[in-house]
From Swiss-Prot:
This is Beta-mannosidase A. Keywords: Glycoprotein, Glycosidase, Hydrolase, Secreted, Signal. It comes from Aspergillus niger. Gene3D superfamilies: Galactose-binding domain-like (2.60.120.260), Glycosidases (3.20.20.80), Immunoglobulins (2.60.40.10). N-glycosylated. The lineage of its organism: Eukaryota, Fungi, Dikarya, Ascomycota, Pezizomycotina.
Length: 931
């Protein structure tokens, strides 16, 4: 049944009525101060908060402009104390008083003073999620939280606690601060190759004083609602004909009832109609948990689907009666009915082999019994300081995901376990969240104390988010199996088997049972990237036998990640991995000029200025040095090579314009490289590898700096996110030009679940826009039918066979028109897509000035773009500072005489609409022209 370990953190339900026998005081309403010897003064503080932000509000420091990520390191090195003013008005007729912290980051000591002058303190080292202190010995009307102290400078000291552990040389990955693997704190707080290392501290989540009645009281710490098909097992596909099972478990604080009852009510989310009410059976009390189960025979609720045109579900309400026959207390809502997700890693069957699928094993997701193509990206922490991340900000980010035709985000470890409201937003918007435990790119301790601590962390979080239909998977960590174990094998081959054993001890023997004991509806993988498993035996000491490198040539097994910074092979299809699923891949680029201007002074806006280079953390410093020019030059050089190898080299006389053009050029390379890979992976859905997912690195930025992101800090879209929106459409036409052999193939790829049919028009133009005689020997139109989750080749030739006078003066325009049914829909929908191909790199093309004309309709709030004298490649609409939003289409091709009317979605506007006068349009021609 349900498994709970120790003080497995507290989840406050602040809306619970006082009838539950509790009095709750939100400590965010109290007055707080922040102090430190390093500051030598006291400043006002907020709660929840983080030290850097309180110092910023008090005017002690500024934003991390320029190189302030280095200049502010004194904050992480100091000890800091939050102190409340006396908290008055507490009740004196309650049986116990509890102090509940939802999140303290990270090494904290709490001291409490109340009117009887009695002091209670407890060290917290560290707090993985929430925690609650034992009941105070007396109920008093006044409490002073004398100190919530956070210890700084521990990254060096913590190593002394683990002197018995010796890692193999050159294996552990230090980005800036050392020894992060010993601390249960957001690992990217200590630096990563896409973000700064502020190592923030503070009470980053709410805190409460909870008073429980002497006779009848319930305080909900956590709720686990597991909804699955009868007889379902995590690693096997559920039988969709079986009835639903609801297994509910409530972790409570206070005296456990002897004979409690539990009940659920299921309603249609939209109409509010009650579909069924049930009393749970086999209610049991164990530890601090009350658990019950019921089978929903005969109930067929509306199901949740990812990226459905309408998210129609049923909502579950859970109630608890402390004593049988007494009035029930509503303790939980918002359990949306959904078929559990299943990660299929089973062996390829003979039926699949007969369909042309290569031997090996599957690696794809299934929802409600349907396999589907996962399209998305990787989510990193959206800010260095979580307390300024708002629900509105995440909602806007997720809207960009939906608009970008993505249905899945991989929640990368190691950030923080996501807030509940983020899962709520994913539920609402139909976004799947591949979730991971917070272990990344490191070897971690495996002593009993460490494992006991992380076991509580895992149990709490599995139970906390299990009711969300957006939860797609739990993975044990990031790249532990695919990166860290091979690093051990290379650096210390004699120790390899030992560290494989340590890996299995934690990520399989410990984590897998903890997941399976707390949910039957979600699959588990011990690492983000694996070759899958050989077998599962839950009675074995290592219940999942990983495949590792026990693979056979010609067979495919697991998922892949891929980073190749050799730009000479960026568009070589033979350099891309062939697997069942791509969970990470990418290349970095510069943010736009407007985003750079938020953080860097004008005099520093040069491509290789000191400030720009030191804000680039790829390659990372590997320590706390502040002159990482040598490593940074590697990443800057990679971007430079990507530009000069394939694109016109910007050469503007004005240094700001030149800097902006270079930033844009790096984005063109990044977007083209991702597009090339995603077209390759999506085509794989119809190839022997049966490839069913691509999640690129990364969705968004944590600050203003070079990174792999498609959405810049502040919300501005790079070229990448626009191009991903286009190439993630349901049915696409894609050209594949092999520049070595000269072959040119055109494929149609579909992620619909049923066949789609239509035509593709193929039109050859020279770059002045004139049709090439005889269409270069290419058919003008090709009909096609493509199967569900499949791809089909509609045209193939060799460049040498085409009637092209000059391959540097030619472009193939592809226009698809089709009809088919979207997933989970009975209606036929018209679908279109446009693409293009050139047979020379952009830098070598004989482009002409396209004569772009730009207009704006205030009545329609649309922009009109027209090419008048040549083909416009990489047509790019841009908007000025003072507004944030996105164009409905961008980075497109325009032929002469072609006019596009494009809408713009405004998210923020501080210009009172004046921004429209400063919209600009450019193309590849502008990158080439000297100015």
């Amino acid at each position: 049944m349900r498994h709970s370990i120790g003080l497995a953190a507290a989840l406050l339900a602040p809306t619970l009525p006082v009838a539950l026998g509790q009095h709750i005081r939100d400590l965010s309403s109290e007055k707080w101060t922040l102090s430190s010897r390093a500051l030598n003064r006291t400043v006002p503080a907020q709660f929840p908060s983080q030290v850097h932000l309180d110092l910023l509000r008090a005017g002690v420091i500024g934003e991390y402009h320029g190189l302030n990520d280095f200049n502010l390191r004194w904050i992480a090195a100091a000890n800091w104390t939050y102190t409340s003013q006396p908290i008055k008005g507490l009740l004196d007729n309650y049986g116990s008083t509890w102090l509940v912290f939802d999140g303290l980051d990270t090494f904290a000591t709490i001291s409490i003073l109340w009117t009887a002058n009695r002091i209670h303190g407890q060290s917290v080292s560290p707090v993985s999620g929430s925690m609650y202190l034992p009941a105070l010995e007396a109920c008093q009307r006044r409490i002073l939280i004398r100190k919530v102290s956070f210890r700084g400078g521990v990254t060096a000291e913590v190593n002394t606690c683990y002197l018995h552990i010796e890692w193999p040389d050159d294996v552990q990955l230090t980005y800036e601060y050392p020894n992060r693997w010993f601390m249960r704190k957001e690992q990217s707080d200590f630096g990563w190759d896409w973000g700064p290392a502020f190592a923030p501290a503070g009470p980053w989540k709410p805190a409460y004083i909870v008073q429980l009645d002497k006779k009848e009281s319930v305080y909900v710490l956590n709720t686990d609602l597991d909804i699955y098909r009868k007889n379902q097992i995590n690693y096997l596909p559920p039988d969709q004909s079986q009835p639903w099972v609801v297994n509910a478990s409530i972790d409570i604080l206070g005296p456990l009832p002897a004979k409690p009852t539990m009940s659920i009510e299921v309603r249609d989310t939209h109409s509010g109609t009650i579909l069924t009410s049930r009393t749970l059976n086999n209610v049991s009390v164990a530890g601090n948990a009350i658990t019950g189960v019921t089978v929903l025979d005969g109930l067929n609720p509306k199901l949740w689907w990812p990226q459905s045109s309408v998210i129609r579900t049923s909502t579950m309400f859970l109630s608890l009666s402390k004593v049988e026959g007494t009035r029930p207390w509503p303790v939980w809502t918002n359990g949306r009915a959904s078929a559990p997700f299943f990660l299929n890693q089973r062996n390829i069957t003979e039926v699949q082999r007969a369909q042309g699928i290569a031997p090996g094993a599957n690696w794809h997701f299934e929802v409600n019994g349907h396999e589907f193509y996962a399209k998305g990206s990787n989510l990193i922490p959206p800010d260095s300081f979580w307390t300024r991340v708002t629900e509105e900000r995440i909602s806007r980010l997720f809207d960009a995901v939906v608009v970008g035709n993505q249905n899945m985000l991989r929640v990368w470890s190691s950030g923080a376990y996501l807030h509940d409201y983020i899962y709520d937003l994913a539920d609402e918007k139909g976004i799947l969240l591949w979730s991971e435990f917070e272990f990344s790119d490191a070897l971690y301790p495996s002593d009993d104390a460490f494992l006991e601590n992380v076991a509580a962390e895992i149990v709490y979080n599995v139970r906390r988010v299990n009711h969300h239909p957006s939860l797609a998977l739990w993975a044990g960590g990031n790249e532990i199996e695919s990166l860290m174990l091979p690093r051990v094998k290379d650096a210390a081959p004699s120790s390899y088997s030992y560290y494989v054993g340590e890996y299995e001890k934690m990520y399989i023997s410990l984590f897998l049972p903890l997941v399976y004991e707390n949910t039957r509806s979600i699959s588990y993988s011990p690492s983000s990237t694996t070759e899958g498993y050989l077998y599962i035996d839950l009675s074995a000491p290592v219940p999942m036998a990983e495949r590792y490198d026990n693979t056979t040539s010609g067979s495919y097994y697991g998922d892949t990640d891929h980073y190749d910074y050799d730009t000479s092979v960026a568009f070589d299809y033979g350099s891309y991995p062939v697997g069942r699923f791509a969970n990470e891949f990418g290349f970095h680029s510069m943010p736009s000029l407007q985003t750079w201007q938020q953080a860097v002074d004008t005099e520093d806006l040069y491509f290789n200025s000191s400030v720009v280079m030191l804000r680039n953390h790829h390659d990372p410093a590997g320590g706390l040095m502040t002159d990482n020019y040598a490593n940074s030059a590697t990443g800057m050089g990679e971007m430079t090579m990507g530009v000069i190898s394939y694109y016109p080299i910007p050469s503007k006389s004005d240094h700001i314009s030149n800097f902006s053009a270079w930033c844009h050029a790096t984005q063109l390379f990044q977007a083209d490289m991702y597009k090339s890979q995603i077209q390759f992976y999506r085509r794989g859905s119809g190839m022997p590898e049966r490839q069913l997912g691509s999640l690129y690195w990364q969705l968004e930025d944590i600050w203003q700096a070079p990174s792999w992101a498609g959405i810049e800090y502040g919300g501005r879209w790079k070229v990448l996110h626009h191009v991903m929106r286009d190439i993630y459409q349901p049915v696409i036409v894609s050209p594949f030009w092999n520049y070595t052999t000269g072959s040119l193939d055109v494929y149609v790829t579909s992620d619909l679940w049923s066949p789609a049919a239509g035509t593709v028009d193929l039109t050859w133009l020279d770059l002045s826009g004139r049709p090439i005689a005889g269409n270069a020997g290419t058919p003008k139109s090709v009909p096609f039918t493509v199967g569900g989750l499949n791809s089909t080749r509609i045209y193939g030739t060799n460049v040498s066979s085409l009637g092209l006078p000059d391959t540097k003066d030619a472009v193939l325009i592809l226009s698809l028109s089709a009809h088919g049914r979207l997933p989970n829909s009975d209606r036929t929908t018209n679908l279109t897509h446009e693409n293009y191909a050139t047979l020379s790199w952009p830098k070598d093309l004989k482009i002409v000035d396209p004569g772009l004309k730009l207009g704006y309709s205030s009545k329609k709030t649309t922009v009109t773009v027209e090419a008048t004298s040549g083909v416009s490649l990489y047509t790019w609409l841009d908007y000025p500072e003072g507004v944030v939003g996105y164009f409905e289409e961008n980075a497109f091709v325009l032929a002469p005489g072609e006019k596009k009317e494009i809408g713009f979605t405004v998210l923020d506007d501080t210009t009172n609409g004046a921004w429209v006068r400063n919209i600009t349009v450019q193309s590849l021609w502008d990158q080439k022209v000297r100015g």
